[in-house]
């Protein structure tokens, strides 16, 4: 009986030790990125200079990373060069907290007179067979962190389209972590005769 109890105690100790190791190992993504891309006019294919690119990372908390909601974790912004190129640095996104996970980045791209970004030729493959579309999307994201991906911006043609696009904000990001993006949005709002976004 004592031998059985000793084995049981040893088994419980082993299981608890494994659980402790798992709990205190870093969780979430490892280093990800960098992200490289070129932004072009969807209609003409010509590069777009001066587009603001904002990358945002969020932290999910709670059991299974779902019950506690999410909050801002980090951001980086840059502006495209004369050839439309941009670069976002790699990130270490692990955390010691087993009940949180860093995810992202989500990309916000703004250039006055243009709409929301998409991967090049998305209209040709993105609305086809769901499995084909999903695989192509994964391939584009892999390319984004390898040789670089081409992103398209559609040119807006009406004031109403520009008004809708001017509300394209990363509201979860503090103003001091997206000054270029906020400046570009506020210039667009001013050109439309509207009040600027107040920093928070």
Roles of regions detected by a PLM:
Residues 47, 55-56, 93-95, 124:
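A short acidic/small-residue loop/turn micro-motif
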Residues 11, 99-200:
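Feature of secretome-associated and extracellular-like proteins
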Residues 2-14:
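N-terminal Sec-pathway targeting helices
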Residues 17-48, 54-56, 164-200:
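Beta-strand-rich domain onsets/edges
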Residues 28, 66-69, 96-100:
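Short consensus segments that form the blades of beta-propeller domains
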Residues 42-49, 79-83, 111-115, 156-159:
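A short, structured loop/turn motif at beta-sheet edges
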Residues 61-91:
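Short, acidic Ser/Thr/Gly-rich low-complexity loop/linker segments typical of extracellular
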């Amino acid at each position: 009986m004592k031998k059985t109890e000793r084995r049981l105690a040893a088994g419980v100790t082993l299981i608890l030790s494994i659980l402790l190791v798992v709990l205190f190992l870093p969780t979430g993504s490892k280093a990800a990125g960098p992200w490289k891309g070129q932004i072009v006019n969807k209609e003409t294919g010509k590069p777009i200079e001066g587009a603001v690119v904002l990358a945002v990372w969020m932290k999910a908390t709670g059991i299974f990373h779902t019950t506690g909601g999410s909050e801002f974790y980090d951001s980086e912004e840059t502006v495209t060069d004369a050839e439309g190129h941009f670069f976002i640095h790699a990130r270490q996104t692990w955390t010691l907290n087993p009940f949180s996970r860093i995810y992202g980045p989500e990309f916000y791209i703004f250039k006055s007179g243009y709409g929301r970004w998409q991967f090049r030729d998305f209209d040709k493959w993105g609305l086809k067979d769901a499995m084909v579309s999903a695989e192509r999307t994964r391939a584009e994201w892999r390319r984004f962190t390898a040789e670089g991906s081409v992103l398209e911006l559609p040119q807006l043609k009406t004031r109403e389209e520009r008004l809708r696009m001017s509300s394209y904000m990363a509201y979860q990001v503090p103003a001091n972590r997206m000054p270029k993006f906020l400046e570009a949005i506020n210039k667009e709002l001013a050109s439309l005769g509207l009040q600027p976004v107040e920093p928070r």
